[in-house]
């Protein structure tokens, strides 16, 4: 990838691990960004994927796309970042980025000065907590405010 292009990091863990919902949103977002923008390079970040993927070959490939995978599962990464609050920046896995986007409710730690973009799709975990597992409600109630 040319060094002069801005590098946009995107957490694509949901795109790899979820067939619908936020996973589909993230896959469509990446496709649309690549189709409509030729000025940026994209560093797609994922936690270690499961053995079986719900969607075969979920991510695009190309000269402006670089996939970086952490050696830990999403469960372990989120425990480190949001339960233990270890400030291990996502750039440890992605390398240098100019912007980081998390499309799935929470941001990982980033290096000081790295701009971030967060998508919070809804607040149903606040308004309808009975429709979620208690563990997920507890996690989101803790992690989302820290990310916003």
Predicted regions and their residues:
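Carbohydrate transferase catalytic cores enriched for Leloir-type hexosyltransferases
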Residues: 1-148
